[in-house]
């Protein structure tokens, strides 16, 4: 189920303040955030947002196709290293 239309999209207040400040100053520096649940809005297009994946911040450049998705979708939290082969070998 999606979020109710009357509530609107979720975006962290601190992230919104940083974006508005950068848009007023025409600044495009990297914004660091821990808010993976924030929805990408049209005002974010062209910005680079460093999203925390639990270990480090992953820079994500926002494009038009990303609008409506969550920031956390573009910063994977798990790394798959592959299945370990059996060390004993065949009998």
UniProtKB/Swiss-Prot annotation:
Pfam families: Ribosomal_S19 (PF00203). It comes from the Bacteria. One of its GO terms (molecular function) is structural constituent of ribosome. Coiled coil: none annotated. GO terms for biological process: ribosomal small subunit assembly; translation. InterPro entries: Ribosomal_uS19, Ribosomal_uS19_bac-type, Ribosomal_uS19_CS, Ribosomal_uS19_SF. Keywords: Ribonucleoprotein, Ribosomal protein, RNA-binding, rRNA-binding. Protein S19 forms a complex with S13 that binds strongly to the 16S ribosomal RNA. Belongs to the universal ribosomal protein uS19 family. This is Small ribosomal subunit protein uS19.
